[in-house]
């Protein structure tokens, strides 16, 4: 099972379902989710084990384009003040094609949303990047434009978390260059039940 996971390519899992945005890497967390769902299905346990009904992935290609278009690399290299980095990322613009894709996602999800990191280094079994990067949640209520702004902000803050002090210190400790890390993003509905105006995960 271990060697099978190491050699597993999770990208087709998302592409075949129309859950993929961009043409880059999907990162370690997204790979793990795809592998787990595939393994459960192959074992005939889909009725016993629940997963979110959709899992969208924004690949590292979008991260690279976002960084380049908004000239963010000089900022992340030029300051240790993470609040400045977060501010710059929040003010930066996502590609219009990605905004359209995010709006499409929100039209398919009517529950609260989790926006999760899936960096390429999270796929390295020799490293422990768990908890180093951001996960953001939002209630996904209101009109589409409002929800889209919330989702965009969450994606940008997950991107910014690539450069948070904890992650940067961990990479320095292990001699990992900044350019070696790239961030994909997972967007999932939060599994739970709604009772009246409340949602219970």
Task: Identify what each model region corresponds to.
Residues 191:
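Extended, highly charged clamp/arch subdomains and adjacent linkers
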Residues 1-186, 194-195:
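N-terminal beta-alpha lobe that positions the nucleotide/phosphoryl donor
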Residues 196-201:
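Short, intrinsically disordered, charge-balanced linker/junction segments flanking boundaries
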């Amino acid at each position: 099972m271990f060697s099978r996971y190491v050699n597993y390519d999770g990208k087709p899992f998302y592409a075949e379902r129309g859950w993929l945005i961009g043409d880059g890497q999907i990162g370690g967390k997204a790979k793990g989710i795809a592998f787990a769902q595939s393994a459960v299905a192959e074992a005939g346990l889909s009725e016993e084990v629940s997963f979110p009904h959709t899992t969208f992935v924004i690949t590292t290609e979008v991260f690279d384009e976002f960084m380049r278009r908004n000239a963010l690399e000089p900022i992340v290299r030029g300051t240790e003040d993470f609040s400045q980095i977060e501010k710059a990322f929040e003010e930066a613009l996502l590609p219009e094609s990605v905004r359209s894709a995010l709006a499409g996602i929100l039209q398919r999800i009517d529950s609260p949303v989790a926006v999760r990191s899936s960096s390429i280094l999270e796929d390295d079994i020799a490293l422990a990047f768990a908890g180093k990067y951001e996960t953001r949640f939002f209630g996904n209520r209101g009109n589409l434009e409002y929800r889209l702004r919330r989702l965009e902000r969450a994606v940008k803050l997950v991107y910014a978390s690539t450069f948070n002090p904890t992650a940067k210190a961990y990479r320095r400790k292990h001699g990992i260059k900044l350019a070696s890390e790239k961030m994909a993003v997972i967007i999932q509905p939060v599994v739970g039940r709604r009772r009246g105006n409340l949602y219970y995960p």
